[in-house]
Structures are given as C-alpha cells and as structure tokens.
Amino acid sequence: MTKSVMIVEDNELNMKLFRDLIEASGYETIRTRSGLEALDLAREHHPDLILMDIQLPEVSGLEVTKWLKDDEELRHIPVIAVTAFAMKGDEERIRQGGCEAYISKPISVPRFIETIKSYLGDA
C-alpha cells in the first residue's frame, strides 16, 4: 500500500512544489489549504505523515498540531512543520508544540526529501 502525506499549506506555489516533490518520490498526497479541514481529512484518510504550514490564515498550524496530538486516533501521525519562522528559538517552540521535525522555507529540496523519507522510508 502506498504511503501518504497530508499537506496543509495555504500558499498555492508551495503546495504545488511540495505535492510535486512528494509524488515524484512515490508517495500519495492529500492536500488542504485550510487548517480547519486538516483534522477531518486526517480522520478520513489516516495519512502516514503530515506537513504543516505554521502560518495559516484562519488558525495557527501549531494549534492544528495540538488538535491532532490530543486526538487518540491521530496522535501517532508524525507532523513536520514547514515554516518561514527561522529565528533562534522557533524550532524549539515548534517542537514543543508537538511537531516531530521542522523544515524552514525556502526549502532545500534534498533536505526536504530526506526528511520525508526519514519518516516514511522509500516508497
């Protein structure tokens, strides 16, 4: 069974880039621009990994991550924060918010793919 990655990202160009890189690596994607939809989509599809933008329009990606980690059915799914926040202390704050890993924007393509594969293995 093909492993899947849910992408929660409101920027259309970032969404396309992440989708293309992930699908080219052999994984399926589930996509939403809305942090409010993320919980329902995760319950419906049970992705193997979630990529979470931290700066979403209606709700913080850290808040969505908290909802995921508070849900008995979903808390095992690793969440990788993808964010432009790259100041000292941001990674620690993001990890304390429940994210297992952190990728800063603009992304490094090799590091992005390496991080995804470190959680999912080869497709």
From Swiss-Prot:
Annotated ranges, domain Response regulatory: 4-120
Job of this protein: Essential protein that is involved in the control of cell division, probably through the regulation of ctrA. Its phosphorylation status is regulated by PdhS.
Residues recorded as bearing 4-aspartylphosphate in the entry: D53
Subunit structure: Interacts with DivL, PleC, DivJ and PdhS.
SUPFAM superfamilies, per database record: CheY-like
GO molecular function: DNA binding
CDD domains hit by this protein: REC_DivK-like
UniProt-listed GO biological process terms: phosphorelay signal transduction system
Name the record gives this protein: Polar-differentiation response regulator DivK
UniProt note: phenotype after gene disruption: Lethal.
Chief subcellular location: cytoplasm
Subcellular location: Cytoplasm
PANTHER family: RESPONSE REGULATORY DOMAIN-CONTAINING PROTEIN (PTHR44591:SF3), STRESS RESPONSE REGULATOR PROTEIN 1 (PTHR44591)
GO CC annotations on file: cytoplasm
Result for mutant: D53A: Abolishes phosphorylation and localization to the cell pole
Species for this entry: Brucella abortus biovar 1 (strain 9-941)
InterPro entries: Bact_response_regulator, CheY-like_superfamily, Sig_transdc_resp-reg_receiver
Pfam families: Response_reg (PF00072)
This protein's UniProt keywords: Cytoplasm, DNA-binding, Phosphoprotein, Transcription, Transcription regulation, Two-component regulatory system
